């Protein structure tokens, strides 16, 4: 293989600079992502203040593969409506721009359906909707605003080993209140601006957190 030509070097430099830019700490908070709001606030604080990308995570890679397979499986099925995958969304919410990416959006004549895919382990049975996932779909509910047709949200859990699938049609009353999400956003913004490390939320995700060696909260987790 040839590695020394000018195109190779150009491509290498462009990609390296892109990831370097994405890994930089944030000096001034201009927006938050749905993931940053949904996950442990301490993890989000470290991501913003310390920078860095968790690209080497085997768990993350596995999730990306599952997402790609599932999105490909639904987007060309006409009986589901017109389906779009990896749908970017950005909207002001409680004084700051919130950015997200919906896994799949299926639109038919009578329904506007938001679908989020999650990988899990159901070896000992389904453990219920994770709080971070509930926050995520609740944010998408509000960020997509009112629609002329019926709006629905689905959480799809897939067992990483067996392929077992559990589909949850989120009832409107299960969606978190705007105020609860707004308070969470304001807390994260305030923690960033005051340079104060927020309280952690120990849970299953601590196992895969790239900041667990500095946080130590995972030691208090029961998972």
From Swiss-Prot:
Q: Which domain of life is it from?
A: Viruses
From which organism does this entry originate?
Answer: Acidianus filamentous virus 1 (isolate United States/Yellowstone)
Q: Which residues form a coiled coil?
A: none
Which Pfam families does the annotation name? PDDEXK_1
Know the name of this protein?
Uncharacterized protein ORF223
InterPro entries hit by this protein: Cas4_exonuclease, PDDEXK-like_dom_sf, PDDEXK_AddAB-type
């Amino acid at each position: 293989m040839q590695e020394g030509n000018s195109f190779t070097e150009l491509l290498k430099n462009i990609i390296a600079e892109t990831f370097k830019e994405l890994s930089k700490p944030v000096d001034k908070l201009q927006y938050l992502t749905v993931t940053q709001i949904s996950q442990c606030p301490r993890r989000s604080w470290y991501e913003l203040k310390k920078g860095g990308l968790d690209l080497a995570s085997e768990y993350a890679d596995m999730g990306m593969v599952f997402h790609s397979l599932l999105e490909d499986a639904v987007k060309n099925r006409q009986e589901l409506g017109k389906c779009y995958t990896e749908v970017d969304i950005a909207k002001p919410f409680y004084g700051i721009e919130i950015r997200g990416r919906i896994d799949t959006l299926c639109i038919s004549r009578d329904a506007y359906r938001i679908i989020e895919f999650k990988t899990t382990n159901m070896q000992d049975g389904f453990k219920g909707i994770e709080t971070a996932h509930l926050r995520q779909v609740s944010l998408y509910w509000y960020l997509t605003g009112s629609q002329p047709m019926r709006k629905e949200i689905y959480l799809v859990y897939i067992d990483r080993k067996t392929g077992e699938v559990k589909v949850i049609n989120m009832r409107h009353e299960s969606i978190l209140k705007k105020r609860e999400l707004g308070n969470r956003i304001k807390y994260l913004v305030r923690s960033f601006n005051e340079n104060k490390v927020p309280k952690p939320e120990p849970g299953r995700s601590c196992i895969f957190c790239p900041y667990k060696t500095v946080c130590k909260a995972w030691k208090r987790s029961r998972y």
